């Protein structure tokens, strides 16, 4: 089980990402449309003034059950350990054990 502080930190990052996503997107479009170099620099400074944790690249996926940051499957939002346990307990509909 992950520390509660790290799980809360990730939640805070995802909230900041959602809050600033439109502003960040519009500033990036303005940079691409800017004609002069000074104009691009001023827009870039505005972009740099935004909180670091508002960038989407800083958000890391975590398992919903355990909070584990590694081996998290996007389809389920669960780590491989939890998927295995839940699949064996028939708690994931449509998931079957592979055999060939």
Swiss-Prot record:
Disulfide pairings: none
Subcellular location, record wording: Plastid, Chloroplast
GO biological process: translation
Molecular function, one GO term: structural constituent of ribosome
Top-level taxonomic group: Eukaryota
Keyword check for Phosphoprotein: no
UniProt xrefs under Gene3D superfamilies: 1.10.287.1480
InterPro entries, per the entry: Ribosomal_uS14 (IPR001209), Ribosomal_uS14_bac/plastid (IPR023036), Ribosomal_uS14_CS (IPR018271)
GO annotations of cellular component type: chloroplast; small ribosomal subunit
Keywords, ordered alphabetically: Chloroplast, Plastid, Ribonucleoprotein, Ribosomal protein, RNA-binding, rRNA-binding
UniProt family annotation: Belongs to the universal ribosomal protein uS14 family.
Subunit note: Part of the 30S ribosomal subunit.
NCBIfam families: PRK08881.1
Annotated PANTHER family: 30S RIBOSOMAL PROTEIN S14, SMALL RIBOSOMAL SUBUNIT PROTEIN US14M
Functional note: Binds 16S rRNA, required for the assembly of 30S particles.
Protein name (Swiss-Prot/TrEMBL): Small ribosomal subunit protein uS14c
Originating species: Zygnema circumcarinatum (Green alga)
Lineage of the species this protein comes from: Eukaryota, Viridiplantae, Streptophyta, Zygnematophyceae, Zygnematophycidae
């Amino acid at each position: 089980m992950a520390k509660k502080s790290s799980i809360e930190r990730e939640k805070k990052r995802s909230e900041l990402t959602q809050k600033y996503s439109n502003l960040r997107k519009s500033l990036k479009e303005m940079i691409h449309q800017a004609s002069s170099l000074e104009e691009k620099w001023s827009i870039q400074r505005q972009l740099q003034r935004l909180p670091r944790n508002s960038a989407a690249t800083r958000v890391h996926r975590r398992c919903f059950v355990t909070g584990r940051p590694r081996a998290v499957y996007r389809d389920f939002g669960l780590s491989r350990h939890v998927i295995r346990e839940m699949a064996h307990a028939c708690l994931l509909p449509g998931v079957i054990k592979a055999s060939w």
